[in-house]
Curated annotation (Swiss-Prot):
Its main location: secreted. The gene is inlB. This is Internalin B. The lineage of its organism: Bacteria, Bacillati, Bacillota, Bacilli, Bacillales. Disruption phenotype: Deletion of both inlA and inlB prevents uptake of Listeria by human enterocyte-like cell line Caco-2. Single inlB deletion no longer invades various cell lines. Decreased synthesis of phosphatidylinositol 3,4,5-trisphosphate (PIP3) in green monkey cells, decreased infection of host cells, decreased association of host PI3-kinase catalytic subunit with tyrosine-phosphorylated proteins. Deletion no longer Tyr-phosphorylates mammalian MET. GO terms for molecular function: heparin binding; lipid binding; metal ion binding. Coiled coil: none annotated.
């Protein structure tokens, strides 16, 4: 029997078959029905305590009232019950109806179907739109051929393992994830599982008698298990919602494509969110700013047997917002990534000779002491500082420290006290030198170091490291030109960080477009790494530049444009700057095509449009290259 999965058609078909099989009350091979019986004439409402169900039985037996008495012979005459949308909450008493072959109780309020256990002749059972969760009571219904349990909120279908004789099964609009048990139901010709939470369909591979299969609105991304179902006449696979496991946000994100056709080949994404690209087998995104998810839409026509289907849906990749916690122990910094809104794992308490570790604090000198049991990661990078308590006010030590570059003007004193009358000079001349600390003291809660043969200075002016640490280093997209070359240079790394070497004077690059690649912050300032003509040059102080393009200048819009006839040779770019390294091509290939403008930016007085077709991202071009009419 072939069926189209249409609820109205399904129930019309069932009603017709109910009439055809209305005389199906004989038990095969003369077997005796093990059902409960009444021995004396009994009022209907005493047998069937649910008022609504009692009314159904009254009407079925053509009685005037539920107080009318009935005999077991009269109950034996009932072979089908149709009581859809009747507000029935219990079918208690149905065990006295041994010859029921068809039972239609859709749209009621049933939760317990244990009374059905002994209905050995039951062949058709439809219980859509109830509140049934436990299917174990169906295990002895060996004549059951057609079962419908749609819209019940079912998550566990393991109770169906005892029903291998089923030929049609409707389980749509539930909460099913695991269909392993269905591999046992090899006689099925119709199976509906639409609108569930199914991702693994391997258990269906052996159901070769299937003619009608409904799998729309699930989480399916791999069709290989369906390749052998050659008897299919109807197959539905649309609107799949596939959710990957969350991963950390990255500025350059790579996600493998796992959507597969029946032959195992990858299904190419049709539309990729957030300007992503597809480079088989990976989907790639450039995400300089955090977004909580990315996705792509897929579409693939599929033919299996006689069935033609549209396999399409969306794959969503959730992203975790992670930030950096820096643990600073007297200038030595260890960094770790932590998801926003979660608790931070406490690191091993640091040790320091002559000091007792007090705790981790949000500021070097005080602030909030971090409670690793109750405090949660905020939505930004931050530093926790190890705070120690001196065991004595002054003692002998033997340490090596360096002057922090930005502390060069800090004072040196005869005693561990900030008093101009005791001042001997500044730390400027001692930069970049390894300095020996031979004494330490605390005064007013401040830690002081005595530099051997030099004098006293605050410990906060010194560092364990010769070089500055970068507070962050991230990819950015921007363009700039030199604003102030005087006294500024270009470095292989941000100045005064480990490995930084002089490249050139900044004046050499005056007037040139500088493509900004990365941004880093050190205690001195914020730095940009830049390239010119596609060649990476180095790092420069951002204060020396004038940034004429950054992504925040882009504004969303919605326009339709066409390439101007005389502008087909003009170029389009990855960003709204006419720079050859980001050039993508010319507008000639899009001549006479309808283009969508989804973003605009005004760069140095010049209006730019970001264009795309209905499904493909193109790039940025000057608005002057386009016109409103075809």
């Amino acid at each position: 029997m072939k069926e189209k999965h249409n609820p109205r058609r399904k129930y019309c078909l069932i009603s017709g078959l109910a009439i055809i099989f209305s005389l199906w009350i004989i038990i095969g091979n003369g077997a005796k029905v093990q059902a409960e019986t009444i021995t004396v004439s009994t009022p209907i409402k005493q047998i069937f305590p649910d008022d609504a169900f009692a009314e159904t039985i009254k009407d079925n037996l053509k009685k005037k009232s539920v107080t009318d008495a009935v005999t077991q012979n009269e109950l034996n005459s009932i072979d089908q019950i149709i009581a859809n949308n009747s507000d029935i909450k219990s079918v208690q008493g149905i065990q006295y109806l041994p010859n029921v072959t068809k039972l239609f109780l859709n749209g009621n309020k049933l939760t317990d179907i244990k009374p059905l256990t002994n209905l050995k002749n039951l062949g058709w059972l439809f219980l859509d739109e109830n509140k049934i969760k436990d299917l174990s009571s169906l295990k002895d219904l060996k004549k059951l051929k057609s079962l419908s349990l749609e819209h019940n909120g079912i998550s566990d279908i393991n109770g169906l393992v005892h029903l291998p004789q089923l030929e049609s099964l409707y389980l749509g609009n539930n909460k099913i994830t695991d269909i392993t048990v269905l591999s046992r139901l090899t006689k099925l010709d119709t199976l509906s599982l639409e609108d569930n939470q199914i991702s693994d369909i391997v258990p269906l591979a052996g159901l070769t008698k299937l003619q009608n299969l409904y799998l729309s609105k699930n989480h399916i991304s791999d069709l290989r298990a369906l390749a052998g179902l050659k008897n299919l006449d109807v197959l539905e696979l649309f609107s799949q919602e596939c959710l990957n496991k969350p991963i950390n946000h990255q500025s350059n994100l790579v996600v493998p494509n796992t959507v597969k056709n029946t032959d195992g080949s990858l299904v190419t994404p049709e539309i990729i969110s957030d300007d992503g690209d597809y480079e088989k087998p990976n989907v790639k995104w450039h995400l300089p700013e955090f977004t909580n998810e990315v996705s792509f839409i897929f579409y693939q026509p599929v033919t299996i047997g006689k069935a033609k289907a549209r396999f399409h849906g969306r794959v969503t990749q959730p992203l975790k917002e992670v930030y950096t916690v820096s643990y600073d122990v007297d200038g030595t910094v260890i960094k770790t990534k932590v998801e926003a809104g979660t608790r931070i794992t406490a690191p091993k308490p640091p040790t320091k000779q002559g000091y007792v570790f007090k705790g981790w604090y949000t500021e070097k000198n005080g602030g909030h002491e971090w409670n690793f049991n109750t405090d949660y990661m905020s939505g930004n990078d931050f530093t926790l500082y190890a705070v120690f308590k001196a065991e004595t006010t002054e003692k002998t030590v033997n340490l090596t420290r360096y002057v922090k570059y930005i502390r060069g003007n800090a004072g040196i004193y005869k005693l561990p006290r900030e008093d101009n009358s005791l001042k001997q000079g500044t730390l400027a001349s001692h930069r970049c030198k390894a300095l020996t600390v031979d004494r330490e003291a605390r005064n007013g809660g401040k830690l002081w170091y005595r530099l051997k043969n030099i004098g006293w200075t605050k410990a906060e002016n010194l560092s364990l490291d010769r070089y500055d640490k970068m507070e962050y280093d991230k990819g950015v997209t921007a363009y700039a030109r030199v604003r102030n070359a005087s006294g500024n240079s270009v470095w292989t790394k941000p100045y005064n960080t480990a490995g930084a070497k002089h490249v050139n004077k900044l004046s050499v690059y005056q007037g040139k477009n500088m493509r900004i690649l990365r941004e880093a912050k050190t205690p001195i300032t914020t730095w940009y790494q830049f390239s010119i003509g596609g060649k990476v040059i180095g790092w420069v102080d951002t204060r020396a530049l004038n940034t004429f393009y950054k992504q925040s200048m882009e504004k969303p819009t919605r326009l339709t444009r066409y390439v101007s006839a005389n502008k087909a040779g003009e170029s389009y770019y990855k960003v709204p700057v006419a720079d050859n390294p980001v050039k993508r091509g010319t507008l000639a290939k899009y001549k006479n095509q309808k283009l969508i403008v989804d973003c605009q930016a005004t760069i140095e007085g010049q209006l730019w449009y970001r264009i795309r077709t209905s499904s493909t991202f193109i790039g940025w071009t000057k608005a002057a290259n386009l016109r409103a009419q075809k």
